[in-house]
């Protein structure tokens, strides 16, 4: 599950996004120079660095016999897929109206890779177990919280 959005691949996409933000302009200025876009990028960068640290923690935990990394992997899956979707979504926003194009438009940038990957990670969020289900599993199994009560007659 954790390999669905490896942090090093995510950092590579961040670097590609930074390159895109240097090329795309708004009011004659590259988007990387606009505080709102730059702030969103920095938030994503911080999350990726945290994910890389978490991945190293999981790797070192595997070296210690008896260490359970199941919950850590669930957290990695949850945060990894959500983060990739957020990152690809920023790229869509950076491209403006061209970011909304999909499939066979002659105006696509990078053959529509950003749009495809955006939808791919949306599918992983849904298909790999919705984020809410993942959060419930982490809460119940990892934190020992009680299961949600069942409503009678529902």
For each of these PLM feature ranges, what is it?
Residues 9, 13, 47-50, 76, ...:
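Catalytic-loop motifs flanking and including active-site residues across diverse enzymes
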Residues 16-20, 86, 137-141:
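Alpha-helical scaffold segments in soluble metabolic enzymes
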Residues 33, 43-47, 68, 72, ...:
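Secondary-structure capping and boundary motifs in well-ordered enzyme cores
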Residues 1-7, 98-154:
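Glycine-rich phosphate/cofactor-binding loops in nucleotide/flavin-utilizing enzymes
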Residues 22, 26, 35, 49-106:
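C-terminal helix-coil-helix/basic helical segment that borders enzyme active sites and/or dimer interfaces
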Residues 41, 45, 55-58, 118:
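Short alpha-helical scaffolding segments that buttress acidic/His motifs in well-ordered protein cores
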Residues 1-51, 124:
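Glycine-rich beta->alpha junctions and the first turn(s) of the following alpha-helix
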Residues 14, 34, 55, 88, ...:
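Alpha-helix initiation and N-capping motif
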């Amino acid at each position: 599950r954790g390999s669905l959005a490896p942090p090093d691949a995510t950092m590579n996409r961040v670097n590609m996004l930074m390159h895109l933000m240097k090329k795309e302009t708004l009011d004659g200025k590259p988007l990387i120079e606009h505080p709102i876009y730059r702030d969103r990028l920095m938030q994503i960068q911080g999350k990726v660095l945290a994910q890389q640290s978490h991945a190293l923690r999981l790797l070192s935990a595997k070296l210690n016999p008896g260490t359970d990394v199941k919950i850590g992997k669930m957290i990695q899956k949850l945060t990894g897929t959500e983060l990739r979707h957020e990152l690809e979504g920023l790229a869509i926003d950076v491209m403006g109206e061209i970011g909304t194009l999909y499939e066979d438009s002659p105006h696509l940038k990078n053959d529509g890779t950003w749009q495809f990957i955006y939808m791919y990670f949306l599918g992983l969020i849904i298909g790999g177990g919705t984020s809410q289900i993942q959060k419930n599993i982490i809460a119940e199994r990892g934190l020992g919280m009680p299961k949600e009560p069942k409503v009678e007659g529902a």
